[in-house]
Amino acid sequence: MKIRIASRASPLAIFQTKEVIRSIESLNEGHECEIIKIESDGDLTDKPLFEIGGKGLFVSKLEKSLSKNEADIAVHSLKDVPTELAPPGWHKFEIVAMLPREDFRDVILLKESIKFHDLKDGSKIATSGPRRKAQLLAINPKFEIIPIRGNIETRINKLINEDLDGLIVAKAAMNRL
């Protein structure tokens, strides 16, 4: 039996999808899996999520592929799934399986030669989420928080190539790289 799996096209999403495939194949060797890579609306913009529609931007095209029978299942990072799985009028989908939880912590990546204790008032630290922003400002209210979007590779490249001192990312993302 062939299972078509809708996934975002980013390397991290593909890694997660391959984890799902390994789990499926461990249950029954008779399954063949095909990854259907989809560019989500959330991947196509650099604007902050709160300005453009929130987390649903990452899942809507994947769910459309399910409703059009172009895919049999979709793999999402749970942080990208809105609390309502489908807008009114769409097919309703269910979460039927989850991989074991990865490391839940955040990490700070710093420019080469910068140590955490070197961060001072005005240090520019990039992050994408309001929780991380609040935590950084609790450490030092004079940090300059820079909004950042993009997949993990894009964010790391921005840290290296732009005027940033640090970047906050999920440890799980770093583990999967």
What are these regions (language model features)?
Residues 1-177:
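Domain-level signature for soluble enzymes in the chorismate/prephenate branch of the shikimate pathway
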